[in-house]
Amino acid sequence: MAGLKQHSGLVVPLDAANVDTDAIIPKQFLQAITRVGFGKHLFHEWRYLDAEETRLNPDFVLNFPQYQGATILLARKNLGCGSSREHAPWALADYGFKVMIAPSFADIFYNNSLNNHMLPIRLSEEEVEEIFQWVWANEGKQIHIDLEAMTVTVGDKIYRFELDEFRRHCLLNGLDNIGLTLQHEDAIIAYESKIPAFLR
């Protein structure tokens, strides 16, 4: 997969705290075990007026015309709380989100997001509030994420974030668990060549 070094995109301001994984992707859509096809069910209860998903809720922010094509999700604290379903980051990624910004994330959701090549950025509540205000006042304008510098540029202001160096390395280089293993392929082959034949 491609590395995520820098990204510019529109922001959806989801003005809610404690958004749980059941809100992100309800349990009735969890039967599938592939990562594709969940985007259309993202925020199902909030996004649609009917169970068949034929009528969009015009009052839900994801349906606002000015946020169509957004790739960055902005939310309040404790994003991704609730059950530890990996389908939640699958749905967000399948919809098109690449980056999430919030004051805090549920631990399992945070790790699942990184494992699925999405970047969850933690900023202070005050900084997140500033970004909400900027997004509301600057419809249609993009913000810029630089993972190499670990900065978020919003208008003329730069915010700095932290990320574990191992996770940063994986995102920058587009590495999943298999890719990480293959980085050590020569060492693995050398080790296996020393194993007695009867143990192979």
Curated annotation (Swiss-Prot):
SUPFAM superfamilies: LeuD/IlvD-like (SSF52016). One of its GO terms (cellular component) is 3-isopropylmalate dehydratase complex. One of its GO terms (biological process) is L-leucine biosynthetic process. InterPro entries: 3-IsopropMal_deHydase_ssu (IPR004431), Aconitase/3IPM_dehydase_swvl (IPR015928), AconitaseA/IPMdHydase_ssu_swvl (IPR000573), IPMI_Swivel (IPR033940), LeuD (IPR050075). Keywords: Amino-acid biosynthesis, Branched-chain amino acid biosynthesis, Leucine biosynthesis, Lyase. GO terms for molecular function: 3-isopropylmalate dehydratase activity. Pfam families: Aconitase_C. Gene3D superfamilies: Aconitase, domain 4 (3.20.19.10). NCBIfam families: leuD, PRK01641.1. Catalyzes the isomerization between 2-isopropylmalate and 3-isopropylmalate, via the formation of 2-isopropylmaleate. Belongs to the LeuD family. LeuD type 1 subfamily. Heterodimer of LeuC and LeuD. This is 3-isopropylmalate dehydratase small subunit. It comes from Actinobacillus pleuropneumoniae serotype 7 (strain AP76).
